[in-house]
Amino acid sequence: VPLLFALTAGGAFSVVYGLTSALRRRGPGKWASWGPAAAGIVAVLMVVVLGNLGGAAQIVSNAWNAVTSGASIPPFDFWASSRMMPGQIIITEFPFWTFLFADLHAHLIAIPFTLLAAGLSLNLVLTSGEARLNWRTAVLPLGALALTIGALWTINSWDYPTYLALGVVA
């Protein structure tokens, strides 16, 4: 599970860093030199740390109750954020919860591969207009994308159609 966490963080950083670097090169205006790195760090936080707003709501609610009634702040309920629909058993897990509790399911294992597929697709889009691109330099990225999307079929088939469409569009 720690390896999947690290691969997910690295994938999120890489995809967003690559995208913002490309926008910085192509777009008008001035971007700070640290802009792509900052965007990558924000992406890591958003993908692997931040989840739904249930945790934030719980903290605010418990703090408000402590301030207004003088009661002590109860311990944080990690499970509450994974079941957000009152009166129902709808599971609303998010990556941090899944990593925290080592809930090793296909949707967790697939996250680094979905980011890899997104990154490889982005690479194809960003390099498609380069003059030096020929069939030899395109075979490796296309092969890697095909292998990654094919692996998603085995890892978590629910992700396969989405990333197949993304790969075809790229």
What are these regions (language model features)?
Residues 128-149:
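Short hydrophobic alpha-helices at membrane interfaces in multi-pass membrane enzymes
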Residues 34-100:
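Aromatic-rich transmembrane-lumenal/periplasmic boundary elements in polytopic membrane proteins
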Residues 20, 26-45, 139-140:
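Start-transfer (signal-anchor) and selected internal transmembrane alpha helices
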Residues 164-170:
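Hydrophobic transmembrane alpha-helices of multi-pass, membrane-embedded glycosylation machinery
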Residues 2-24, 114-120:
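Transmembrane-helix motifs of polytopic, lipid-linked glycan transferases
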Residues 1-7, 100-113:
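Loop-to-helix entry region of an early transmembrane alpha helix in multi-pass inner-membrane enzymes
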Residues 98-101, 142-155:
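Membrane-interface alpha helices of multi-pass inner-membrane proteins
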